[in-house]
Structures are given as structure tokens and as C-alpha cells.
Amino acid sequence: MHGSLQGNAALLDRLMAGAATLSCEVAVCAPYPYLAQVQSTLAGTPILWGAQSVSEHASGAFTGEVSASMLRDFGCHYVLVGHSERRQLFGESDAAVAAKFVAAQQAGL
């Protein structure tokens, strides 16, 4: 859990300053509260953006979770699945990671 509007703006400015020299795809995966900032700041640049996690559930009573279709509806391109911190700190199993991967793929992420 890192970031702030001001800190994100500074980081994104530095990334955009080097965007013209990129020889690979670059994506920024931000915490949910900052997705709108990242989306608007990176619009029109070659830098893509995504979220840091996704629910394996398509819908339902999963308070605080964000589905893959919600992310895609918002214009998200990428999502991190199976990150070591989520696996270690939240106990995400291979089965949970696989379910999240399937959900992300089905939504076009």
C-alpha cells in the first residue's frame, strides 16, 4: 500500500518523460483508489495501466472486491495476478490464483 495523489503524479511524470525512448511495453499497476488518476494522466501516452488485484468472482456479495468486468468496463488493460505479496500475506492459493487468472482472461485483461 504505497502512493498518494502527489507522489503518483511525480512518478507518472518521470515515467512519461522517458516514454519516447521505450523499446518495450510498460504498464503501471496502481491501487484501486488511484486508477482514475493513472488512467487520465497516462491517456495519449504509450504507457498502459492496470490494477493490482482482481476478484475471482464475477459478481455477488463480496464487499471490497473488484471484478474483472468492472476493471475492463473502466478501461483497465492489465491486472496483477499471483503476486508474491498477495500469496504470502493473504494466503492466495494456486487455485485462487488460477481462478483470478481465468476471470481476468475472460474479461479481456
Regions found by a protein language model. Give the residues of each.
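Glycine/small-residue-rich loop that forms an oxyanion/phosphate-binding "nest" at active or ligand-binding sites
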Residues: A43-Q106
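Conserved N-terminal beta1-alpha1 strand-loop-helix module at the mouth
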Residues: M1-V66
